[in-house]
Amino acid sequence: MDKKTQGAWLLHHARKLQATTNQDFDSIAFAGKSGTLLSAISAERQSVVTQQRLEALARANHISPKTELPAIVAELARQKLILPGSGGVEVLGLTGHSVLEHTSRIFDESSHEAHEEAVIFVSEIASETPTTDKAIAEVVSDNLKLSRKEVGDTLDLATNIGFFDSEPISAQEKLLFNGNLFRRDDARKVNAILSTLKAPEAALLTEVNQKLQETGCLPLET
C-alpha cells in the first residue's frame, strides 16, 4: 500500500473514531487528527496562522484546543512542517497533496500496535474486493504476527466502529466489504463470482486491479 493510500485511511478511520469512546486505536486517531489539522492549515492562504485561528481550525475539526492541540502542534513541529511561535505557527512549505504522506509518516513513526496496522490493511483489501473474514484472517495473521483470536477480535471491533462493513454469509463466516463502494447484495454476488475463479483467473484479476491502481485506467483493445 502506498503512503497516500495509507494516509487516506488514517483520516477516514480517525473520523469514525470521533463517534466512539474506543481507546484501542490511539495511534490512528492521533495521526488522523494531525493530518486533518495539517490539511486545514495547508488550506489557509497565510504563511503564518495565528493562535486564535489555529484553535478555531482545531475546534472546527473536532480537536480539543486544550487537551489535543498542543500534542499535535508538537508533532507537526517535530516533523518540520510548522514552526511554533508565541502568536501562532509558521507554515513551512506545506502543500495540500502532501498531507496524506505526512499523515502516513506520523503513524509509521508512532508506537502503534499491530492491530492498528491490521485494520488499515483490511480496509484497503475490502475496498478492492469483498472478501471473507476467514480468508483475511489468515493473511493478517501471517503478515502481522497476530493470533487468529486477536485478528477475529480486531475485525469485530473494526466493523462495530465502521472502518469497514460485514455481512454474515454462513454460521461461521462473514463477508467484509466497503459499504461506500459495494451494496450488501452486490458484495455477496461479487464474492460468489470470485470464489468460482480458478487460480490463473484469480491471478489475472489481481494483475488488472494492480494496473488500475497504478494508472487509474486501462486502454480498451479493439
What are these regions (language model features)?
Residues 1-222:
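Non-catalytic recognition/regulatory regions in large multidomain proteins
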